[in-house]
């Protein structure tokens, strides 16, 4: 059996991550699919978004690398989720801002959701917000060694 080098181990890890991201993109729910139609191809004020971006061991539903913004679209299974709080804390600690919307808000109030995203991207929303229909957490500035 050939020895595994660091390069082949890393490549295998990247391939698994890429495959998982691909599976997640293919299983988008209706709300995620509709929001993606608005975010793709720089349609929202020229910002480039990607789907299912790996950040550490987590995958962001949508992310704008330029603005370091993660957008999550949540179903009812996320209500009061400790897992999401840990995940959000990780992303914020690594310099990402995180905004979460409920599926229902994306489906029925899409324009308001888009306006909120634009406000964040334009820097008009500069503090944490926790409301019944969304949550926004500002990313921390990360100092690299």
In which residue ranges do the predicted regions lie?
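Solvent-exposed, charged helical/coil patches
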Residues: 1-47, 124-145
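Basic, amphipathic alpha-helical patches used to engage nucleic acids or provide basic targeting signals
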Residues: 22-28, 51-121
């Amino acid at each position: 059996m050939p020895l595994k080098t660091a390069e082949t181990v890393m490549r295998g890890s990247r391939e698994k991550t890429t495959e998982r991201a691909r599976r997640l993109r293919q299983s988008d729910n209706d709300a995620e699919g509709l929001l993606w139609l608005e975010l793709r191809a720089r349609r929202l004020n020229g910002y480039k978004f990607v789907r299912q971006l790996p950040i550490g061991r987590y995958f962001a539903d949508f992310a704008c690398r330029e603005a370091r913004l993660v957008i999550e679209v949540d179903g009812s299974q996320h209500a009061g989720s400790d897992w999401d709080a840990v995940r959000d804390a990780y992303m914020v600690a690594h310099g990402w801002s995180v905004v979460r919307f409920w599926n229902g808000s994306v489906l029925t109030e899409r324009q308001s959701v888009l306006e909120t995203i634009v406000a964040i991207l334009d820097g008009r929303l500069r503090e944490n917000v926790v409301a019944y229909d969304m949550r926004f957490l500002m990313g921390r500035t990360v100092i690299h060694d």
